[in-house]
Each structure stands twice: as C-alpha cells, then as structure tokens.
C-alpha cells in the first residue's frame, strides 16, 4: 500500500512516538487528575477528548492549515495565549473549587463525562506546540517528493494518535488503582490539587513566554 511508510521508518517513528507520548505534559496531568477525581471513566473521557483534538490537528496538518498557522505570527500568538489562558483557568479551578480532584461521593469529577471529554479536547486544540509538532516532527519521516506524501502524513498522524492513546490508557489504568487510597486521605487530595494547579500554571507560563517557535 503506497500510503504505508517503509518498515524502518515505521519502527523509528514508533520508538519516537512512545517516548513523546510518555513525556509529561498538561494533557497527561489532566488524565491523572480526572482519573483520581472520578475513576477510569473520567480519565478515559479526557483521553478521548485529547485524542479528538489530535485528530483535528492531523486533518489540519494534512490539508496544510497547520503550516499556515505556524507561518503566521499573529495567528500563532493568538492560539498560544488562548492556550495559556485555558491552562490558567484549569489551575484556578483546582485552587478555588478543588475541581481537579473532586472524588466520587463528593460531586464526582465536576460536570460529568462530557466535561472531562471537553476539557481534554480543549487542552490539545489550544496548544500551538502541537501544531509545530505536526509541521516539524512528522515531515522528518516522509519524503517530500513522494507522490503519496499527503497520505503517509495522515497515516503517521493516526499512528501517533494510536500510540498516544495506548500509552496514556496504560497510565490511566495504573492511576485508577490509587483512587481508593486517595479517598481515604482528603488532605493528600488537596495537596494534589495544589500540585495540579502548579503544573498548569507552569505549563501556561512556558507556553506564553516560550517566545521562539
């Protein structure tokens, strides 16, 4: 099939994809917090939302829209600051309401599965670093002169989503084991809220002040 890269390229891409997917970021912090807040269903709902966001980025990149965004300083900055503001909003919610880790029996994960899904979706849609990932990382595994370059680009985008979903699903499954222990220690949960807020704030600052693209 012409849209499939060579086995060597696929192996190199898979190895890089696993390392990238396992690197902590705002989305992984969100998966953990939603899992501890409402159990696996909320963790997987947030994961589904984040993967939907990656799918949107994949389509945009395959159509060339991501390259246009990356080339436009104003558009890039607009998305960058919108993403930073959203991360700060999540940090504020964790500090003000304990929304990051409100356990079952105390109101669930705050807003139900739909909210967990939407939060995961927005955390990836408003991250311009993902745009740059798709326009700088994926092309390294594709020959620009290949007649099937667009199809291979789309295939690798889907492959990265599959890798990310698998890695983070395993992390969510492991995190779910700590739910019972967390319920027995409300103070630890509050400290996790503080940690979550700190992480979101740090990611927001890094995103807003990153400057270079």
For each feature predicted by the language model, list its residue ranges.
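Selective transmembrane alpha-helices of multi-pass membrane proteins
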Residues: 71-100, 167-171, 181-213
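Hydrophobic/aromatic residues within the transmembrane alpha-helices of Major Facilitator Superfamily
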Residues: 18, 22, 55-59, 92, ...
